[in-house]
């Protein structure tokens, strides 16, 4: 199981195929996504990579956080996240993961925070049908109707779908296809919509319900902190 990456949503556009078909895509940008630390089964009970992306000023940063970035010898990061990996997919601390960590045509799962909608009614929030247009109904056409029973149970149960705050939820969209890659600018173009607003942080992982392409680099495609060579695809590593 390979590591994912932390990307930032740029926006949506479209690309054209050789046959003239247009594909709506979301542009995701890798902003200096580096490995900050390792989580091992011996020390932590599980195996994972801690990644950081973006830039952050140290003025209001706690001393403990500054020490973590200093120990990894990387610049302070705006966004930090962990990705579970297998033991053979560990990437050196300080390495920068590049856009060609993924390959064109593979499927990925993206996770982000949905756009906030504020206080919403039952029709917008839960797709309720509302009340009738006529037959004695006035003013309450967009009401949700009854919320409980009668004297028994005599209450509204917890988790009842009602009006309330909508959005700002953690959303994962499965099986988005990678359409194009721009390694120089660190861009990943995936087909379809990605949850979140422009500038929002997105976690991109290999799709769990799709097979990993044979030409996907293992443990990943990255650039070492000392300027060393990048990791080669699995086929090249095995001498195929």
UniProtKB/Swiss-Prot annotation:
Residues 139-164, 215-240 are annotated as: Disordered. InterPro entries: Ribosomal_uL3 (IPR000597), Ribosomal_uL3_bac/org-type (IPR019927), Ribosomal_uL3_CS (IPR019926), Transl_B-barrel_sf (IPR009000). GO terms for cellular component: cytosolic large ribosomal subunit. Keywords: Methylation, Ribonucleoprotein, Ribosomal protein, RNA-binding, rRNA-binding. Pfam families: Ribosomal_L3 (PF00297). It comes from the Bacteria. Part of the 50S ribosomal subunit. Forms a cluster with proteins L14 and L19. NCBIfam families: L3_bact. One of the primary rRNA binding proteins, it binds directly near the 3'-end of the 23S rRNA, where it nucleates assembly of the 50S subunit. This is Large ribosomal subunit protein uL3. It comes from Rhodopseudomonas palustris (strain BisA53).
């Amino acid at each position: 199981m390979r590591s994912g990456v932390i990307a930032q949503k740029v926006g949506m556009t479209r690309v054209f195929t050789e046959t003239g078909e247009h594909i709506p895509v979301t542009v995701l940008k890798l902003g200096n996504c580096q490995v900050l630390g390792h989580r091992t089964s011996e020390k932590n009970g599980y195996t994972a990579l801690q990644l950081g992306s973006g830039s952050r000023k140290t003025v209001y940063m706690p001393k403990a956080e500054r020490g973590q970035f200093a120990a990894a010898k990387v610049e302070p990061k705006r966004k930090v996240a962990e990705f579970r990996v297998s033991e053979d997919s560990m990437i050196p601390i300080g390495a920068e993961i590049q856009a060609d960590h993924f390959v064109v045509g593979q499927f990925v799962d993206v996770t982000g925070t949905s756009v906030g909608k504020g206080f919403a009614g039952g029709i917008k929030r839960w797709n309720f049908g509302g009340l009738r247009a006529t037959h004695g109904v006035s003013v309450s056409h967009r009401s949700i109707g009854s919320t409980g029973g009668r004297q028994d149970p005599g209450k509204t149960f917890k988790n009842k779908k009602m009006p309330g705050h909508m959005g700002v939820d953690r959303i994962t969209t499965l099986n988005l296809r990678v359409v194009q890659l721009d390694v120089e600018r660190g861009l990943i173009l995936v087909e379809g919509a990605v949850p979140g607003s422009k500038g929002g942080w997105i976690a991109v992982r290999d799709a769990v319900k799709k097979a990993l392409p044979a030409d996907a680099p293992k443990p990943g495609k990255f650039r070492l902190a000392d300027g060393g060579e990048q990791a080669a695809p699995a086929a090249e590593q095995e001498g195929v």
